[in-house]
């Protein structure tokens, strides 16, 4: 044990970067705004139920875009609705994130071919950070997507664009079984 180690242990000094502190604060207080449009909204509501307890991840749902930093688009986005989605997105403060939940918001879903009124993916009007596939995706998949957003926030650095951070995140693999295993353990303890 050196002189520096003794000084740190005696005076409770914390050594970290500003990036780590800012990212920890942002990922520990993620405030999503749900934009439930179809079947996926039911699964999104189930995810907010007490048996999944999103608050343990620091996720507190908000109903105002001015208080949220994550928009969850869950369901079919029509052409008439596109302008409203853009307006809500622009009202969100920076840094803001978008999670696209379900086949309809990802690529148009079953309406992509013959639905002239359906937008063929919400990413055509606003930038999407994380996609959650499924029709509708289970709550565990949505929790996995929320954890991906938190991982994206954790990897952000001052001076590095979000596109570079997304590229790094895509290089990592994500196992949705981890969420299921964690849930089973927490239910066994209860």
From Swiss-Prot:
Topology in the lipid bilayer: Peripheral membrane protein
Name of the gene this protein is made from: nuoB
Homology family: Belongs to the complex I 20 kDa subunit family.
Keyword NAD recorded: yes
Presence of keyword Membrane: yes
Documented EC number(s): 7.1.1.-
Intracellular or extracellular location(s): Cell inner membrane
Reaction it catalyzes: a quinone + NADH + 5 H(+)(in) = a quinol + NAD(+) + 4 H(+)(out)
Primary localisation category: membrane
Subunit structure: NDH-1 is composed of 14 different subunits. Subunits NuoB, C, D, E, F, and G constitute the peripheral sector of the complex.
Residue sites binding [4Fe-4S] cluster per the record: 39-40, 104, 135
A single GO BP: electron transport coupled proton transport
Chain's role: NDH-1 shuttles electrons from NADH, via FMN and iron-sulfur (Fe-S) centers, to quinones in the respiratory chain. The immediate electron acceptor for the enzyme in this species is believed to be a menaquinone. Couples the redox reaction to proton translocation (for every two electrons transferred, four hydrogen ions are translocated across the cytoplasmic membrane), and thus conserves the redox energy in a proton gradient.
InterPro entries tied to this protein: NADH_UbQ_OxRdtase-like_20kDa, NADH_UQ_OxRdtase_20Kd_su
Cofactor note: Binds 1 [4Fe-4S] cluster.
Protein name in UniProt: NADH-quinone oxidoreductase subunit B
Gene Ontology molecular-function annotations: 4 iron, 4 sulfur cluster binding; iron ion binding; NADH dehydrogenase (ubiquinone) activity; NADH:ubiquinone reductase (non-electrogenic) activity; quinone binding
GO cellular component: plasma membrane; respiratory chain complex I
HAMAP family the UniProt entry points to: NDH1_NuoB
This protein's UniProt keywords: 4Fe-4S, Cell inner membrane, Cell membrane, Iron, Iron-sulfur, Membrane, Metal-binding, NAD, Quinone, Translocase, Transport
Co-factor requirement: [4Fe-4S] cluster
């Amino acid at each position: 044990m050196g002189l520096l180690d003794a000084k740190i242990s005696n005076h409770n000094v914390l050594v970290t970067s500003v990036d780590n502190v800012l990212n920890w604060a942002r990922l520990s207080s993620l405030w999503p705004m749900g934009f439930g449009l179809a079947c996926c909204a039911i699964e999104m509501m189930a995810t907010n139920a007490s048996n999944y307890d999103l608050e343990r991840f620091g996720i507190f749902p908000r109903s105002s875009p001015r208080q949220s930093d994550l928009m969850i688009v869950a369901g079919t986005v029509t052409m008439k609705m596109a302008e409203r989605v853009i307006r809500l997105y622009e009202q969100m403060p920076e840094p803001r994130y978008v999670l696209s939940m379900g086949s309809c918001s990802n690529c148009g879903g079953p309406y992509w071919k013959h639905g002239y009124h359906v937008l063929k993916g919400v990413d055509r009007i606003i930038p999407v950070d994380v996609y959650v596939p499924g029709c509708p995706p289970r709550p565990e998949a949505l929790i996995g997507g929320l954890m991906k957003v938190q991982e994206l926030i954790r990897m952000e650095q001052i001076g590095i664009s979000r596109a570079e951070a997304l590229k790094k995140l895509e290089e990592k693999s994500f196992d949705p079984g981890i969420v299921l295993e964690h849930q089973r353990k927490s239910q066994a303890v209860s």
